[in-house]
Amino acid sequence: MSPIEVLFQTANGTNATNATNASGGANATNATGTANATNASAGGVGGGQTFPETLSQLLGFGANPDPGLQFVFGMVGASLVATIFLTLAAFAGIWGKRKITAAFTDRIAVNRVGPFGLLIIVADAVRLLSKEVIIPDSVDRPAFDIAPFLVPFSAILGFAVIPLGTGLQLADPETGFVFVFAASSIASLGLLMSGYASNNKYSFLGGLRALAQNIAYEIPLVVTAASVVVFAGTLRLSEIVAMQTEALVTIAGVSIPSWFVFVNPFAFVLFLTANLAEVGRNPFDTPEAPGELVAGYMTEYSGAYFVLLYLGEFLHIFLGGAIVATLFLGGPAGPLLPGIVWMLIKILAVYLFTQWARSAVPRVRIDQLIEIGWKGLLVMSFANLVLTAIIVGFIA
């Protein structure tokens, strides 16, 4: 039994030892396993079943098809996830950004092309993709060409281990927590390459700022997330989500879920702030900073390359929202609606917060940004981790 389960049972006034003595060790163990399996299923986790396994069973090939079919089903799942989040990035991301910003600033957003202005995305895509990809003479061509693909690729790779709903997780490795942060950090290489390869001072400064910012905030981001792992006792994301399906406390007949945002709200605030800097949104958008660096590392890009970098930004915003939802908001767990719907609602809620910050909070200077990361968030994240470890050790 993990420390967090002990905490939940204590909060609900449950005495695990008495229950074990009354029922017998074996029976209590079986009952606990059954309850956990039921909670995991209700929370939309599906007991850790992956999408290839789900698709194989639906098509009548059983839970363990041969490696060739597993590869095919995995590619189908990867295509589905990529399609869902590319569409989300295009419509909820780019169109939503305009609508939300207009609402916060009391303006009228796009409303001419299609219903509610939705077809402006199609118009923008046709306009940008029909433009010539201009390659300046002095660029480092291989790095210049590769960089735009690394940014969206790293985000889509990170979604591979995110539990999106019942049977909608492409892979469920034991080290899924480590994998998702490692995959998302590949984007830093793409941003630096795009800035360096452009042979442009503004682009180079934007790339350096992006790298410095990601290093400064990646450490507190991971350290803060590690406090969730200390509580959960596992690195497997599906198990972290399943653990949040239990009731933390029941007040007047209303059960408060054991989401880690309620267990450790300080860690949630730290993680949300570090994530905001990690995805480069206001007030931490110094790598682009239009008033200072034109378009930062994207200055020399046009046409399809610009589209890839721009979509990559929004994909990373949604990946950050998915990580927040998985670690702190119960992932796909929720009543009545399917797990995938709850997951998208939570991701969009985090996205709404980033757009509020973009409209309401002014940009900080690069020196202030680095100071906040190294002297503020890093210290608080380690303090949070140590305090969490002490509490868990005391409970256990």
Predicted segments, located by residue:
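Selective transmembrane helix interface/packing segments
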Residues: 2-12, 40-396
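Asparagine/serine/threonine-enriched low-complexity, disordered tracts
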Residues: 9-41
